[in-house]
């Protein structure tokens, strides 16, 4: 949505966008979502309510693929609350292959009885309201959710978030050592979720369950804050 620019410009853009959408949105669900005040970008991380979010999808392109499940886990710098989290299997319009069923750790019966996304989209947005969303790889959750809202309601749903993959890239793939590796043709360090967690001594979890991956993302972010930032870091400095 936004071209690469200074972090202050990113903050200013999001604040303007939120204010515009709160007025312009015709859909009452999206209107309520945008009327929830955006967290002040100067608020320290220690005072922020976060929501880790993960989508499991049939592919990587929201134009041609669908959401099959989503998981949310609320947390702060002091605690992660998986018992207050949420997990939902979604019935896609396409038929899932046997490989996809196994990959996403869901069953045929779960898919058969699951609601379509349009029946649970309002619940998802309600749970995200008032929180700073944290994901691992922003080019899945935000565009899939945006396109789903646009298909259903004809309006966009965009919001600032924190991307633990982007944070990892910032610290693990920059600097003169990484530039030298690139010139020598050396493969860059992996910033996938499990590989990133291993660098912080975090345990390995079974992947591709949306709530488990949301939990893993929350834990990774807390470890990144301890190593690279501070509880007093302003939340706006990490917005994507």
Regions flagged by a language model, labelled:
Residues 216:
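Short active-site alpha-helical segment characteristic of glycosyltransferases
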Residues 219-226:
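Short glycine/serine- and small hydrophobic-enriched flexible loop segments
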Residues 4, 14-152, 156-158, 184-208:
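Conserved non-catalytic scaffold segment of RNase H-like nuclease domains
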Residues 230-240:
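Mixed-charge, glycine-rich, non-catalytic linkers/tails in nucleic-acid processing enzymes
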Residues 2-8:
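Intrinsically disordered, serine/threonine/proline
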